[in-house]
Regions:
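Signature of long, low-cysteine stretches enriched in small and polar/charged residues
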Residues: 107-152
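Short amphipathic alpha-helical segments
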Residues: 97-102, 168-172
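Hydrophobic residues embedded in beta-strands of well-ordered beta-sheets
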Residues: 73, 84, 128, 153-154
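A short, sequence-level motif marking secondary-structure junctions
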Residues: 61-64, 70-71, 89-94, 146-151
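A short acidic-to-branched-hydrophobic micro-motif
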Residues: 74-101, 143-144
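N-terminal targeting sequences that direct proteins away from the cytosol to non-cytosolic compartments
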Residues: 1-82, 160-186
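Short, well-ordered beta-strand elements
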Residues: 86-87, 152-162
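Short acidic/polar mixed-charge low-complexity motifs
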Residues: 54, 80-85, 139, 151-153
């Protein structure tokens, strides 16, 4: 019987080492980039910020959370343990649909309690909508919603945080809401 041919062994360690170095450089580079990229951005006093077609002037001391903000869709501001979230989206229905959905999400999904009834609000700029307060074991907040039927758009504003210092955060939130209008160019 003929003897089987002997295969010349391939050197696999250089290729494996190159793959390992490429993975290490990729992961290390991403970790380096992540550690050098700030997660928040301070906002200049009096600077108007826009999200979608909504624009407002942030209260002093609030910073933008870069990782939770999406250009043209949402803007998250924070100050201490309190958050101020503005989201905009297209909406072709009536004003009650998204508000009821948000209440259900808070009550059933997040186990929060709605405090009182939904009420109407009007700002000095003429911005009007609906609002309600909510609370849970660790946080409390207020939710505002504006539906612009002509533009077919929805703006939702949510301010929440720990009960400690909430009155000051709500005063800041009301001042930001008072400065808001829906005339930002898109």
């Amino acid at each position: 019987m003929p003897e089987p041919s002997r295969r010349i062994p391939y050197r696999t360690w250089p290729g494996a080492l190159a793959v390992l170095l490429a993975i290490a450089a990729y992961v290390g580079g991403l970790s380096f980039w992540d550690s050098r990229t700030p997660g928040s951005r301070p906002l200049a006093a009096g600077e108007t910020v826009s999200v979608g077609h909504a624009r407002f002037v942030p209260a002093s001391g609030w910073e933008m959370d870069v990782s939770r903000s999406r250009a043209g869709q949402s803007l998250m501001l924070f100050k201490g343990g309190h958050k101020f979230l503005v989201t905009t989206r297209a909406w072709a229905g009536g004003p009650d649909g998204p508000l009821m959905r948000q209440q259900r999400l808070m009550e059933r999904g997040q186990r929060l309690n709605i405090d009182g009834d939904v009420s109407d609000f009007v700002t000095s700029w003429g911005l009007q909508g609906k609002t309600f307060a909510y609370y849970g074991s660790k946080l409390a907040g207020r939710f505002w919603q504006v539906v612009d039927l002509q533009r077919r758009s929805l703006v939702q504003i949510d301010c929440y945080g720990a009960s400690e210092g909430l009155n000051e955060a709500m005063a800041d939130a009301r001042s930001m809401l008072e400065s808001m209008d829906l005339e930002a160019p898109q």
